């Protein structure tokens, strides 16, 4: 089997399960296979999720032991005790937000039920199983491949696709012929999702840091800009003829395309756009219905371009 074809998370899960079970077996613990199950459950998509799920597993297991011991001592080791246990335990883990520990705690309870007692040996056995499973899971899941190259690649490609869309829109305004934008739009949307997911995952792996990330802010900004750009492309498809004002609008969109990089200050282009809108509104009224529709579409495109630029400027200001 080609190891490169196996997902790193699958590989980590297999290693954690085997290692946890081997340690528990070497210690001659009862139900040593349970350590492997805990280790498997501890492998999460990010380090922060792993720590959170491990915490929930430990706390839910402690609650299960205490509640189980009380009920078994009062009612006895009978099926009705399990019924009462679940009626009490389920709402408790939900209220305490310990849902990830539910399966682990149920297995521990079945061990107590099978043994029909709770003594120091059983308590130590269950504690070691839990500690080994959680500990191995945490240790193995500390390895997370770097996402920096993926994020940088998606940022570069997104900038290129957005610039290409502005150039295509400019060409459509000047010629009245619409290129097929759907593939570029779909690809840009896919790149945005991949980049944003990668940035979120990297934030989840950053232990001890705040939940902020410049790359995540970039993808959020581009995501909002993309929706505006989609509207601009839609209006470009409504252009049925070439009008005189279109040349200046096309030149302006090319300027935006040439300066699409996120760190570029947008205020100068916002001022240029406002001047263009003023001249646009002051120009002579359209003569034909087709000319009116084209100028209306151009006006909407400029208004959406203004929102696009203001989103960019807000992003630049937040970085300062």
What are these regions (language model features)?
Residues 1-183:
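A transmembrane helix-and-boundary motif of multi-pass membrane transporters/channels
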Residues 41-42, 101-105, 109-111, 199, ...:
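Long, contiguous hydrophobic alpha-helical segments, chiefly transmembrane helices and signal peptides
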Residues 58-64, 77-79, 111, 129-133, ...:
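Short alpha-helical linear motifs
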Residues 145-243:
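C-terminal membrane-adjacent module
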């Amino acid at each position: 089997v080609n190891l490169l074809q196996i997902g790193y998370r699958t590989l980590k899960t297999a290693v954690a399960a085997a290692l946890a079970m081997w340690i528990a077996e070497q210690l001659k613990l009862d139900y040593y296979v349970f350590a492997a199950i805990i280790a498997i459950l501890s492998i999460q998509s990010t380090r922060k999720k792993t720590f959170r799920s491990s915490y929930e597993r430990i706390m839910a297991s402690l609650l299960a032991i205490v509640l189980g011991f009380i009920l078994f001592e009062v009612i006895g080791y009978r099926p009705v005790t399990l019924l009462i246990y679940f009626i009490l335990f389920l709402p408790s883990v939900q209220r305490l937000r310990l849902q990830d520990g539910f399966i682990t705690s149920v297995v521990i309870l079945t061990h107590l039920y099978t043994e029909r007692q709770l003594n120091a040996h059983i308590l130590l056995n269950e504690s070691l199983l839990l500690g080994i499973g959680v500990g191995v899971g945490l240790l193995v899941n500390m390895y997370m491949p770097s996402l920096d190259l993926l994020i940088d690649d998606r940022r570069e490609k997104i900038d290129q696709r957005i610039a290409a869309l502005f150039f295509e829109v400019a060409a459509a305004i000047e010629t009245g012929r619409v290129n097929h934008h759907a593939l570029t739009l779909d690809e840009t949307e896919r790149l945005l999702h991949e980049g944003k997911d990668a940035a979120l995952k990297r934030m989840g792996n950053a232990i001890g840091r705040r939940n902020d990330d410049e790359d995540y802010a970039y993808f959020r900004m581009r995501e909002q800009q993309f929706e505006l750009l989609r509207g601009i492309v839609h209006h470009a498809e409504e252009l049925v003829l070439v009008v005189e004002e279109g040349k200046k609008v096309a030149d302006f969109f090319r300027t935006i395309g040439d300066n699409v990089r996120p760190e570029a200050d947008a205020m100068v282009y916002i001022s240029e756009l406002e001047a263009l809108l003023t001249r646009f509104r002051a120009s002579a009224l359209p003569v034909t219905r087709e000319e009116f529709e084209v100028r209306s579409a151009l006006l909407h495109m400029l208004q959406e371009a203004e929102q696009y630029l203001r989103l960019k400027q807000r992003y630049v200001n937040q970085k300062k």
